[in-house]
Amino acid sequence: MKLAVYGKGGIGKSTTSCNISVALAKRGKKVLQIGCDPKHDSTFTLTGFLIPTIIDTLQEKDYHYEDVWPEDVIYKGFGGVDCVEAGGPPAGAGCGGYVVGETVKLLKELNAFDEYDVILFDVLGDVVCGGFAAPLNYADYCMIVTDNGFDALFAANRIAASVREKARTHPLRLAGLIGNRTSKRDLIDKYIDSVPMPVLEILPLIEDIRVSRVKGKTMFEMAESDPSLEPVCNYYLNIADQILAGPEGVVPEDAQDRELFALLSDFYLNPTQPKTEEEELDLMMV
């Protein structure tokens, strides 16, 4: 099974991806997480350090693929999760999406794709150009990380459009949204009323999750010394269980940009006032 995780930049995709990878490993699956971001920090919370990237390794080998071995590019992370970072060109030069394609090419030549039960692509921000949309060519499911805000849902809608486009030629489905760092879901619900898609989980704003990123640890690793964090791990286990159950998923019908802008803007400009106690009693008496 191959998964691709997308979402607005800074929404918490990498932290979410690492914890989902460990949750899948906890369920007995052999997991490979591939970071598809030039920052090459996707797997930091799994390994505790910035691992060498595939592009760096290829440069050292003068792009002789036959000289690269799995141990040159695959590093072991917490919970037995294997980790790869695609890396990217120098800032302001080259195409990061091209590097993602080269990463997939190398891993295929190493037969790495056949070694794992689950491969999870953690993909750069909300960029859905051809290169960074490449993981969708291989994925069975896409998951979109969002929050209860305008910008993240706008980005989610653009990603949904990419899923729909790729699904024309690939057996790809959108597994659903993952709400992150939000205790509310009213704007998410307004969006999925217009663009029907599942919501896999809603994670509230939890300071320990933010701290885990700085520490270079997953919530599962932190919970080993602090059992009070186990309920937080359950959020990720719930997502893993849904994915392993093989959800039907959807081919989303994204909203047009102007239509979505109006829909989400209306939420802020014309908020629905909660009914007063007296109004609720009147309704009950009718």
UniProtKB/Swiss-Prot annotation:
Q: Which residues form a coiled coil?
A: none
Q: Which CDD domains does the record cross-reference, listed alphabetically?
A: Bchl-like (cd02032)
Record flagged with keyword Secreted = no
> Please, one GO biological process term?
photosynthesis, dark reaction
Q: Tell me the route in metabolism or biology where this protein functions.
A: Porphyrin-containing compound metabolism; chlorophyll biosynthesis (light-independent)
Reply yes or no: does the keyword Ligase apply: no
Task: Copy out the cofactor comment.
Answer: Binds 1 [4Fe-4S] cluster per dimer.
Q: Which residues bind [4Fe-4S] cluster?
A: C95, C129
Self-association and partners: Homodimer. Protochlorophyllide reductase is composed of three subunits; ChlL, ChlN and ChlB.
Mind telling me which PANTHER family this protein's record contains? LIGHT-INDEPENDENT PROTOCHLOROPHYLLIDE REDUCTASE IRON-SULFUR ATP-BINDING PROTEIN
Its recorded name reads Light-independent protochlorophyllide reductase iron-sulfur ATP-binding protein
**UniProt source species:** Acaryochloris marina (strain MBIC 11017)
Task: Identify the coding gene.
Answer: chlL
